[in-house]
Amino acid sequence: MSPEHRPDQHPDVTHFPEPSGQSATRSPSPTYPADSGATAALVVTALLVLTQLYAAIPRLTPISTGLHGSATVALSTAFSLTYAAGFLIWGPVSDHYGRRRTMALALGTLTISTACCALAPSLPALAALRAIQGLSASGFAPVALAYLSEALAPSRRAGAIGAMSTSFLVAGIFGQVLASLVALHLGWRWFFPLCGGLLAVALAAVLAVVHDAASTSGPSGSSLRGQFASLGRLALRPAVVALSLAHLTLLMVFVAMYTGIGGHLESQGMRPSTIVLIRLAALPVMFLSLVAGRIAVRWSWAQTARLGFGVSALGMLGEALLAQSLAGLVAGSIVYVAGVALAVPAMISLYGQVSAPNRGSGMALNGFILFVGTSAGPLLATSSPTFRTLALTLSGILAVALAAITGFKALADVDR
């Protein structure tokens, strides 16, 4: 095998040593306390947490009507901005105080604030509650990813990250569909107490099955100020800047596309129930996240990310060219989502690798960049005059992301 193709020469592939005499199915130990039960609990909880973000997309119209004004800022932007900012807080905090207690605090606050959203009498009140929701919700995903990256046996980590990535993506469809059905049959306010109850159950499950690895069960040797300083140094590395430029676009484009497609289909006379089915069309390809790890073993995580961004750009271009054809629009959205399904676990893994051993900080930066982009998605969609214009704009953004992830690989080689 030539040097340029040796896996150990690539900075974007992590190689975990297999513990001697132990298999991937061994019982949990103080070093690797996570088992399949902990993974399953975190995957389901991730679905519920991210549902709070994506459920805003189909509820903009009913909440705007019910509270007499545009709900875009109160429902979407307030949540997304605090969700993004919260990542920068929770990641270093979990590096210092431990994953389990950080997740417990975040999920407890999220459960209460979610239920309280049902009582919001006005858009400003809803915006304040959604901001609290976003800040508390951001304490789950980066901490859970960091936990799985250190508390699972090394040979099981890629599969767990793939499952979490699938959950993040499925939430994009599940949240929209669940919110649409609740709004249609019960009213938009009922969505919040329903989710509050489910989150309370999830919190109990996480407390029951999640146990910190021995090395992260308490305050770390580094001060909390030191953890934040390391996060700042990480963010300024040239390779990470290129990685972040690509990552910024990932959910920005996803949210913008699904926000825009709803209005586009409504303008063509589609019934809400039909739009729900169209939103569901791309659900099966989201499970491609589960095979991203296998592709990365053969190629690398950076090449898997490039493949994902390339496929998603082609799918989005197809949506632009076939915007007036329902079949073409659905086909393009499926191709686009397939690319996203490959890119998400690849990007998460790349952030985990460049940030080791401070993976909480790495996942914090990953989430912050990702959801800053998400907060811009609805604004981008509502500012475009037509869906075709929106899709063409999003295609160009994805092309820039593809170039950035290509630049990341070159810069990562220099950083070594």
Residue ranges and their predicted role:
Residues 303-347:
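C-terminal transmembrane helical hairpin of 12-TM major facilitator-type secondary transporters
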Residues 87-98, 288-301, 385:
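Helix-to-loop junctions at the C-terminal end of transmembrane segments
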Residues 85-121:
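Conserved MFS/SLC helix-loop-helix module at the cytosolic interface between two early adjacent transmembrane helices
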Residues 98, 119-125, 153, 322-324:
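Helix-breaking motifs and short loop linkers at transmembrane-helix boundaries and internal kinks
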Residues 129-169:
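Cytoplasmic helix-loop-helix junction between adjacent transmembrane helices
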Residues 26-32, 211-244:
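Juxtamembrane intracellular "pre-TM" segments in multi-pass secondary transporters
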